[in-house]
Amino acid sequence: MALYWQVSGQGQDLVLVHGWGMNGAVWQQTAEALSAHFRVHVVDLPGYGHSAEQHAASLEEIAQALLENAPRNAIWVGWSLGGLVATHMTLHHPDYVSKLVTVASSPKFAAQGNWRGIQPDVLTAFTDQLVADFQLTIERFMALQAMGSPSARQDVKVLKQAVLSRPMPNPQSLLAGLTMLAEVDLRDELQHISVPMLRLYGRLDGLVPAKVARDLNHLAPYSEAFMFDQSSHAPFMTEAEAFCQQLIEFTTR
């Protein structure tokens, strides 16, 4: 059974990949704005939204599911966990990716030593909570994503509406996603990316600290980076117009 895709607009192919616990509906506003410039492809990842019947336990399993209907030579935009997916596609299925954009993402989400990120005990707590009450856990995660942003309440409302507008995620895939956030480390592989890369961050993000952006300036010196001052983990919602502008400028350079 194929993944659920929505395609709109005309022009160069651009793929939008959502994050953990969410689905493609989070991109609705972004897709509408970008479809004036691109042919926009929005996917529900395995286990999420209209692809909730599917399951993938690793980045490569997600990639294999995406390859069935993904356009070749496209711009890939990945938010949060979706950034790991888009980076994996760039590294392992390069025919499909012409440019890479990561949004509020990190090659390694879990904190370790000097590397900033989500504390492992927070991820463990999420895993435990997920088993007990996955709907409540997703709501907590939404609040965590929006925390710090001046429009936090509105952001959470939009995220919640997006998630609830489609079938609830598959708990097995939610657990697999948390394992990826806890264990995946692509830092050493970034040097092998040969396509143009843009990294977008929210200055107020509590999940991907601003320091990660600075560290990645050294790990991926060929890439470009931009920090949204008023955003936390969802700059495409908080600063929607500026977000689309950054994408358009990067892809037309």
Please report, for each region that a protein language model flagged, where it lies by residue.
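Flexible "cap/lid" loop of the alpha/beta hydrolase fold
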Residues: 91, 96-132
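Conserved alpha/beta-hydrolase catalytic His-Asp/Glu region
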Residues: 131-184, 188-189
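Short beta-strand/loop motif that positions the catalytic acidic residue
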Residues: 193, 199-201
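Active-site loop/oxyanion-hole signature of alpha/beta-hydrolase fold enzymes
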Residues: 28-32, 41-77, 245
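Gly/Ala-rich beta-loop-alpha elbow adjacent to hydrolase catalytic centers
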Residues: 78-82, 86
